[in-house]
Amino acid sequence: MNKKGLLLVNLGTPDSPHPDDVKAYLKEFLSDTNVIQMPRLLWQPILRGKILPKRSFKSAELYQKIWRKDGSPLMVYAKKQVEQVQQLQPNWIVRCAMTYRKPNIAETLKEMRLAGADDIVVLPLFPQYSVTSTQSVIDQVRKADKNINIVKSFYNDEAYLDLLARDIREAWAKNDYDRLIISYHGVPESYVRRGDPYVDHCTATTQGVLERVGPLTPDNTHQVFQSRFGPTEWVKPYLSDTLRSLPSQGIKRVLVATPAFVADCLETIEEIHVENHDIFKQAGGEVFDVVQPFNEHIDFSKYIASLANRHFAQN
């Protein structure tokens, strides 16, 4: 009887918040040609000469603010998700890996094979597919082991939408909010023009939430994008611009949800809770609350196990 294996993959995190480790992480991340779609001969001198020397120290300061005693929040939650799924499915071999830094995807797959996993499903923890995230996982997996089933997205999966809508519904009911802000990680506009379906996937997720949460409509919900990097145009509207403009329209009480992030990380803890919170308050906003990502919620781990089971069945 074949032994099943499940590999959960997220983006990655530095080994520590020290500038040298942050630099190593950023170098690997920003050298990925799926992420930065420029000729290497043009991009690498810019990356090594200008971006890494400055951004490594700035990012290290941010990581130092969010780092926990037990490590990077993203890694902490990744391990807890693995533990929970392993408890739910004791006969599986369940592991986590990161697209960048450690644990390495290829090395983890090899270890799973040696442990006896014959039938492996890889689940990138990016609900909405993008060339900049999911495709890099696919490329690494295919290079390491071609006989593996990969879940390419789950942005419109009914069970995922039900979980997401439940959390948003419960949070919305706790206060008298003027608007729900649904914020997704952004991508360059040029990538979408070249065929990346990411924005369509985001819009479908937003629509799925609206269909499930009665009080929400297109009139009291904004879909926006965050985490812009560099001088080029990214998909709009930008989260920061939206938050600056709302208070002057009398919209001063907002709830923010981040469906693209299944676990807390720098983009949610620092960028949402601190930077964008301050932007909204400085513009005259009064209430700024955030729907927590799934993190270690057991219902999400049950969903992961169920989703993987469906993909095992397809093999």
Swiss-Prot record:
The keyword Nucleus does not apply. Pfam families: Ferrochelatase. Fe(2+) binds at residues 185, 267. It is an enzyme of class 4 (lyase). Gene3D superfamilies: 3.40.50.1400. Its EC number is 4.99.1.9. GO terms for molecular function: ferrochelatase activity; metal ion binding. Pathway: Porphyrin-containing compound metabolism; protoheme biosynthesis. It catalyses: Fe-coproporphyrin III + 2 H(+) = coproporphyrin III + Fe(2+). One of its GO terms (cellular component) is cytoplasm. CDD domains: Ferrochelatase_C (cd00419), Ferrochelatase_N (cd03411). It is found in: Cytoplasm. One of its GO terms (biological process) is heme biosynthetic process. Keywords: Cytoplasm, Heme biosynthesis, Iron, Lyase, Metal-binding, Porphyrin biosynthesis. Belongs to the ferrochelatase family. Involved in coproporphyrin-dependent heme b biosynthesis. Catalyzes the insertion of ferrous iron into coproporphyrin III to form Fe-coproporphyrin III. This is Coproporphyrin III ferrochelatase. It comes from Leuconostoc mesenteroides subsp. mesenteroides (strain ATCC 8293 / DSM 20343 / BCRC 11652 / CCM 1803 / JCM 6124 / NCDO 523 / NBRC 100496 / NCIMB 8023 / NCTC 12954 / NRRL B-1118 / 37Y). The lineage of its organism: Bacteria, Bacillati, Bacillota, Bacilli, Lactobacillales.
